Amino acid sequence: MTPADLADLLRATAAKVLAERGLDPAVLPDEVTVERPRNPEHGDYATNLAMKVAKKAGTNPRDLAGWLAEALGAADGITSAEVAGPGFLNIRLAAAAQGAVLEQVLAAGSGYGTADTLRGTKINLEFVSANPTGPIHLGGTRWASVGDALGRILAAQGADVTREYYFNDHGAQIDRFANSLVAAATGQPTPDDGYAGAYIGEIAEQIVAEHPEAPTLPADQRHELFRAEGVELMFAHIKRTLHEFGTDFDVYFNESTLFASGAVEQAVETLKASGDLYEKDGAWWIASSEYGDDQDRVVIKSDGNAAYIAGDIAYFQNKRSRGFDLCIYMLGADHHGYIGRLKAAAAAFGDDPATVEVLIGQMVNLVRDGQAVKMSKRAGTVVTLDDLVEAIGVDAARYALVRWSVNSSVDIDLNLWTSQKNENPVYYVQYAHARTASIGRNAAAFDYASVTPDLSQLTAEEEGELIRTIGEYPRVVASAASLREPHRVARYLEELAGAYHRFQTNSKLRVLPLGDDPVSPLNAARLVLVNATRQVLANGLALLGVSAPEQM
């Protein structure tokens, strides 16, 4: 019996109890909450349902809890239901009912934890979207991990997810990038507003190797050549780096196409005509302050040129034309103002601003031996995705970035994340999976196939804890999707790994027969428990884009 099964049973029982006493079952919530108590002595699960609905039903919370306890006590799979405090209900499950979740896990396999709650919802998930003027820095790296994990989690709930990278190949930063390449190719100092780092020289060398005449071309032609070739080479590097990191996109959208196609002008004229832009001081403005921005924003400047937000508005209109029900933007810590701007754009086009969600990620810092690591060997200024992967590897990098809420800044201790110790979270979780795989390999030497597992014998404290933790997984994935918080999956995996390590460390809980002893129904039941644990660990790691090693 999973927590969801118990919640359904509890609601059905409560509806019957209320109806039998002439009380209205309509006061019951659509979803009943059951939680695992912090103190195991309080049962396997607890609920405050009686306290939540008693007043609406016209009765006393303890009385209602007592009626529920009496009815639940007679239900299949329930060992006991006891009233506590002002109306809490503590519930214990029979071992066989509790163990049934293991069979569900093995039957579902990689599908355990998936759901259809977002079936039919078309989501555009835009993340990373780093400028093609240099390697991806740590902020973009965080989104490469978190965004990819969120896409996997939303898809696991049935959503149709389009992962999109907005390629900022239009604007002054591209001109500065081109000027930096020209300077490197012609032996000139880096411009004051240019980009430095070994990668600039490397790209310039590649361009000159392909176009030997490039340094001596007329200035305008030279600038355009280095601009076009440089952007193409830099973005090829970015795509390759992301792919090696395990993050790929369905759509790479070029900002420049919005201007070249006239989409920006068309979007602005549409909003002018609808009255959703207003004119002041010779410029055209959008009322983004009504949606959380600190001030309204200029869309068309007084000189007639488009402000940066004009491209954002046209880009949203493009997404809208592709039929997305929800657009999620994952932006850096310095982009808080974009929340109001993007929601204002949605409202201006007649959409519910709630169809736009903006997630803001805080800063990431690297630490080694207690000291901040601030310089990249290739970028020259900031630490990059390549630097992080070189230092700790892909799995550790992805996990380190995804296990924290994006609302908090992160310090990644390079010594910790390269250690093979339980204090290293990714090692702790992956080692748990490797241990389950090892038992599976060793079990192949015994005749488990002819023995029927008796899940009712899984009564040890460590076994019960592990089973209940396994049963929580679907709820964790669902909450990670609805709250847009992939770190919930990572923290859950650490909890599951801990429960498994405690189970296997107890030498009395043998999975494999001792010596020449035959496989017993209890041995077989414990192997089911191990295999179910292995499956859930693998499923959760897959959602995070982290490998599940068979041995370590």
From Swiss-Prot:
<dbReference type="InterPro" id="IPR009080">
    <property type="entry name" value="tRNAsynth_Ia_anticodon-bd"/>
</dbReference>
<dbReference type="InterPro" id="IPR014729">
    <property type="entry name" value="Rossmann-like_a/b/a_fold"/>
</dbReference>
<dbReference type="Pfam" id="PF00750">
    <property type="entry name" value="tRNA-synt_1d"/>
</dbReference>
<keyword id="KW-0030">Aminoacyl-tRNA synthetase</keyword>
<dbReference type="InterPro" id="IPR036695">
    <property type="entry name" value="Arg-tRNA-synth_N_sf"/>
</dbReference>
<feature type="short sequence motif" description="'HIGH' region">
    <location>
        <begin position="130"/>
        <end position="140"/>
    </location>
</feature>
<keyword id="KW-0963">Cytoplasm</keyword>
<dbReference type="InterPro" id="IPR005148">
    <property type="entry name" value="Arg-tRNA-synth_N"/>
</dbReference>
<dbReference type="Pfam" id="PF03485">
    <property type="entry name" value="Arg_tRNA_synt_N"/>
</dbReference>
<dbReference type="GO" id="GO:0005737">
    <property type="term" value="C:cytoplasm"/>
</dbReference>
<dbReference type="GO" id="GO:0006420">
    <property type="term" value="P:arginyl-tRNA aminoacylation"/>
</dbReference>
<comment type="subunit">
    <text>Monomer.</text>
</comment>
<dbReference type="InterPro" id="IPR035684">
    <property type="entry name" value="ArgRS_core"/>
</dbReference>
<dbReference type="InterPro" id="IPR008909">
    <property type="entry name" value="DALR_anticod-bd"/>
</dbReference>
<dbReference type="GO" id="GO:0004814">
    <property type="term" value="F:arginine-tRNA ligase activity"/>
</dbReference>
<dbReference type="Pfam" id="PF05746">
    <property type="entry name" value="DALR_1"/>
</dbReference>
<protein>
    <recommendedName>
        <fullName>Arginine--tRNA ligase</fullName>
        <ecNumber>6.1.1.19</ecNumber>
    </recommendedName>
</protein>
<dbReference type="InterPro" id="IPR001412">
    <property type="entry name" value="aa-tRNA-synth_I_CS"/>
</dbReference>
<dbReference type="InterPro" id="IPR001278">
    <property type="entry name" value="Arg-tRNA-ligase"/>
</dbReference>
<keyword id="KW-0436">Ligase</keyword>
<dbReference type="GO" id="GO:0005524">
    <property type="term" value="F:ATP binding"/>
</dbReference>
<keyword id="KW-0547">Nucleotide-binding</keyword>
<keyword id="KW-0648">Protein biosynthesis</keyword>
<keyword id="KW-0067">ATP-binding</keyword>
<comment type="similarity">
    <text>Belongs to the class-I aminoacyl-tRNA synthetase family.</text>
</comment>
